Amino acid sequence: WASQVSENRPVCKAIIQGKQFEGLVDTGADVSIIALNQWPKNWPKQKAVTGLVGIGTASEVYQSMEILHCLGPDNQESTVQPMITSIPLNLWGRDLLQQWGAEITMPAPLYSPTSQKIMTKMGYIPGKGLGKNEDGIKVPVEAKINQEREGIGYPF
């Protein structure tokens, strides 16, 4: 799973105890939170010992009574004991993101800004391959020196 930062929120799916949930990737959240209206009624929960800071005033805060099995967006095995409260969407916090091997990268550009603009205008999408189905090569072709001293690649 990969998501480029844009005006769209980074949302991904996870399967907890066999049930699929969609949630916002939130690197600022220490723990994962499931929306109260999405928490299955037959899953045990208890009043949380600690409150949640940073999402305003949540009056009802619960926590799963059990540590739950979870599969990440690319089937990464993990466990979670989520908090549960009235929020509009689920949040995947660092407790899960670390187990999923999540990374935040800001790669240095391989090409000049001018060439990037030209490629973008031609329909290139960063991270996708070239070609009609976006399945072509994704990295630049490296020039190799021909050590046989003949043909293409021979240094003059």
Swiss-Prot record:
Residues 111-156 form the G-patch domain. The keyword Transport does not apply. Its EC number is 3.4.23.50. It catalyses: Processing at the authentic HIV-1 PR recognition site and release of the mature p17 matrix and the p24 capsid protein, as a result of the cleavage of the -SQNY-|-PIVQ- cleavage site. SMART domains: G_patch (SM00443). One of its GO terms (molecular function) is aspartic-type endopeptidase activity. Pfam families: G-patch (PF01585), RVP (PF00077). The keyword Hydrolase applies. Retroviral proteases have roles in processing of the primary translation products and the maturation of the viral particle. Endogenous Pro proteins may have kept, lost or modified their original function during evolution. This endogenous protein has retained most of the characteristics of retroviral proteases. Active as a homodimer. Belongs to the peptidase A2 family. HERV class-II K(HML-2) subfamily. This is Endogenous retrovirus group K member 10 Pro protein. The gene is ERVK-10.
